[in-house]
Structures are given as C-alpha cells and as structure tokens.
C-alpha cells in the first residue's frame, strides 16, 4: 500500500520560522517584513522577537500568515557574553492571539530548559532549538534536551555573520540519539544591512516548505506539528512516499539525492549537474530511521525529517 510521508494533497507554503523586527533587535517593522517576504514567494513568517510574544493579527491576509512565536535565550554566567555558551529556542504558539508566555526562571541549565520545553509543549507550543554552532554548544548541551519539536539545521543570519549557520552534523547526532525532531531552515533575520542586494543581507537564505490543506493558522500549525514539511536552502522535495517497503522521492533537479539511515545502509545517486529528479530505497528492517537529503549544483541542500522505522514498515 502506498503511504505518503508528505501529504499527496494540499499546497506547499514557503515559511521563515525565525525572524526579528523592530519589536526587538531587528531593523524592519512587521509590515515591512510582510511585504519583503511576500515579494520573495513566502506565505508564512514566524515573528519570533526576543523574549516577548507579540501577535500580529493586522498582518493576516489571504496570501500571508504571521505565526505567533517567541525566542527565549539562556546565557551561561561563567564567561563574558561574547564567549558564553547559550541556549536560544523558538516557541511557536498554537493560539494566534496569545500574548503571554509560560512562566519560567531564566537559568542556563539543561534540566531547567527541558522543564520549560515540556511545560510549553503541554500548553501546545512547538519548541525549536536554534543555531548550536553560533551558540557555542556541544552535544552534551542539546542531546539531553526534552520537549523539542524542531531543530534548526540552517540559519542564514549565523552564516552571514560567522559562517557557522549550518547544523547538519548536530542534526544527525539528534537523529542517531533517537530524537525525532523536524529540521528547519530559517533566516533569523535582523536586516541590519537594510538592503536585500547587500552581501550582508540575512533574509531569504533558508526556508521551510510546509504542506498544508490551506493557509490558515490551524492548518499550518497542525501540518508543522505532524512534521509534514522539509527544510531547504534551494532544492525541493516534491513527493515522498513509501510502498511495499520501498521509499520513493521526487525532487526538483538536483546533483545528489540520498536516503540516510541510523547506520551505513544508505543509498545515494549523483550526477554532474542538476539532472536527477527521483530516487528509491528498499528500507532495511533493522534500521531505526530513514531520512532524505538532496543537493543541487549551487550548493543548496534539502532535509526531510527522520522517519521512524515504525512509520515505514
């Protein structure tokens, strides 16, 4: 029987799930963000200003959905901030009009952060762990975290600022450790350059494609919750399904497509140039998960979530 891992029906909506405005330390107003992201084909932006949750109902329209979110930071007290390890996490609200967050004590401690994550998740929030390399964090800092929904596999702002926006290895560690987190690619834009043609522009570099029934808050949030999405800096994962123990993927033209697992039982196809658009993989019964990665000749990469073996066989 054919089982779609990305829904057969619905529409892919382009989303930036990490954004800052003048409401914290960004340079653009929320309305400016809406117009600039609409012009680049985005339909969803999570307004995740620092340490304050602000709904933006005035931005809702038939072609644009603002997600209500907040980014919370926890800084290690043992070093100056420039050298300190930090936790930064986004919390996406299930209620578009929510304007208060879960009470918490700001303590740099994995158990304290996990406690907040679990309490936020109990209230319906989706919790995303952000930019581990920029945060100077080690595996021991993020692998024990509880309550995570998403993992930021790419962050444009960190890549522009310090060339450390990728977290693909850290994401792989999470997968191997049994964490079934959803990968996201985000901008974390602050728009300090205030010029989209500038080499310092930190918008439009990484995005998440969410497949949902419609562009309503409920449908987008539920699709995110179910992991019906993928992260990318370029390539598209257009179809993904499993049938009779074989996974199938259809992509935009790519130069490499991989099925990656909990072990070395993997399968990759490669080409000179972007001439590949599909691949298939017989799922070994003893692996713990399978995920898809694709790459194009421009250096763009796409990541599916890790599909647990129980979802595939």
What function would you assign to each model-found segment?
Residues 40-42, 58-62, 144-145, 173-177, ...:
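Short alpha-helical interface elements
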Residues 2-130, 138-139, 144-147, 152-170, ...:
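A metal-dependent hydrolase metal-coordination microenvironment
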Residues 38, 121, 175-176, 225:
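Alpha-helix boundary recognition
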Residues 150-209:
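Catalytic-core region of carbohydrate-active enzymes that cleave or remodel glycosidic bonds
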Residues 1-12, 181-182, 189-313:
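C-terminal functional module detector
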Residues 42, 125, 179, 228-229:
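Residue-level recognition of short, well-ordered coil/turn positions
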């Amino acid at each position: 029987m054919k089982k779609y891992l990305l829904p057969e029906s619905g529409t892919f909506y382009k989303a930036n799930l990490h954004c800052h405005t003048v409401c914290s330390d960004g340079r653009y107003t929320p309305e400016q963000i809406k117009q600039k992201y609409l012009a680049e084909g985005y339909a969803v932006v999570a307004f995740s200003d620092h340490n304050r949750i602000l709904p933006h109902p005035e931005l809702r329209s038939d072609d644009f959905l603002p997600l209500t979110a907040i980014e919370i930071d926890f800084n290690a007290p043992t070093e100056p901030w420039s050298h300190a390890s930090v936790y930064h996490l986004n919390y996406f609200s299930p209620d578009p009009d929510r304007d208060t967050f879960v009470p918490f004590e700001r303590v740099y401690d994995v158990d304290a952060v996990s406690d907040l994550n679990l309490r936020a998740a109990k209230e319906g929030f989706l919790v995303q762990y952000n930019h581990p390399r920029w945060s100077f964090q080690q595996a021991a800092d993020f692998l024990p975290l509880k309550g995570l929904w998403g993992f930021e596999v790419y962050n444009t702002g960190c890549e522009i600022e310090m060339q450390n926006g990728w977290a693909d290895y850290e994401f792989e560690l999470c997968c191997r450790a049994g964490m079934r987190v959803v990968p996201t690619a985000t901008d974390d834009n602050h728009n300090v350059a205030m010029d989209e043609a500038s080499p310092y522009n930190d918008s439009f570099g990484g995005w998440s494609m969410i497949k949902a029934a419609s562009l309503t808050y409920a449908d987008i949030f539920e699709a995110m919750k179910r992991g019906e999405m993928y992260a990318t800096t370029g390539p598209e994962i257009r179809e993904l399904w499993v049938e009779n123990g074989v996974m199938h993927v259809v992509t935009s033209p790519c130069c490499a497509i991989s099925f990656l697992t909990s072990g070395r039982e993997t399968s990759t196809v490669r080409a000179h140039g972007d001439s590949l658009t599909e691949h298939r993989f017989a799922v070994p019964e003893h692996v713990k998960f399978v995920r898809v990665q694709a790459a194009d000749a421009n250096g763009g990469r796409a990541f599916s979530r890790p599909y647990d073996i129980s979802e595939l066989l």
